[in-house]
Amino acid sequence: MTRTMTVLAALCMLAGCTPAAERSTGADSTAQPNAAAPRADSARRAGAPPDTTPPADISHGEAPVGAPGASPAPVSARLAPREPGRLHHVRMEMRHATVEIASGVKYAAWTFDGKVPGPVLRVRQGDTVAFTLVNKADIPHSMDFHAAEIAPDKYYRNLMPGDSIQYRFVARVPGAFLYHCGTAPVAMHIANGMYGALIVDPPTPLPRAEELVFVQSEFYLTRNRNTEGAYMLDWFEMLGQAPDHVVFNGRAAQYSTHPIDVEPNQLLRLYVVNAGPNRTSAFHVVGGIFERVFLDGSMANPLRGVQTVGVPMGGGSIFEIRLREAGEYPFVSHAFADATKGAVGVLRAVDPNAPATARTGPPMQH
């Protein structure tokens, strides 16, 4: 396989399929949303098979792996160390912002702190989170922490524009947890971008590892008459569970165009949280087998020696793996329709003693 072959082409070869032609969203990074709608055409809606003629680079609108000039720079997947102390002050603002969800595709999102997903939070089991939430948007929003054991009617209530709330909770259970807006209709608020990950470390540290976090989610697009050059949520596509993009960390295939560099035989710990709102993540690393998988908060009985693990909507799991030799290892949701729509990336195992020329393509930016 050459460096110019894309990850999706490689995955299709593994699956014995032929990549479908690119949809209008993301197919041309210079295209404007008002020039081409993201929907499938009427024949597809009627159930006709899609055109299977592969485009020139079989890239689903994304640059080949490591292609020079691939843009935009990726959202960092590196998990930052936990802040010291047992009391963590966290402040978030809910506001609406335009974000890029695929190459050249802008979306009018609802956000925590202006980005999708929201900031990654990290504490230790038994730590206290002192949380402040401020609504700077023009509609009601709220917060639901899956890691918290508190009364929803008291703390997860809707905040009107300009309102705020403060409360504390103790993170009693370790694991990889989702947080999200809980305002009805919840599916609309999640599909518009209001979610993030909260990592709760066990009291006894896990073995040292390179740690990465991936939040899977979906986008359902239609033209936005209110925000020039951006898409908005298609409510009926969302109800029909027909996403235009399925993504890790808010942007389709960003870690295919910008692989994440790791070392061969290095222990990797991947925190995978699935915001949904509709699609289960069938998380898999091509060319590797998970040594241990901690489902949700269960540290006592990890799965061992497994190939693919489902992460349900609203759930999260912790995966440990070693990539046994130098090379490129795609990670995907093994629901390949979702991988084709952007739930795909690459872990690039590079020997640290190899010459710099061995690192083809740009390094991970973080």
Predicted segments — roles?
Residues 1-7:
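Bacterial N-terminal signal peptides that target proteins for export
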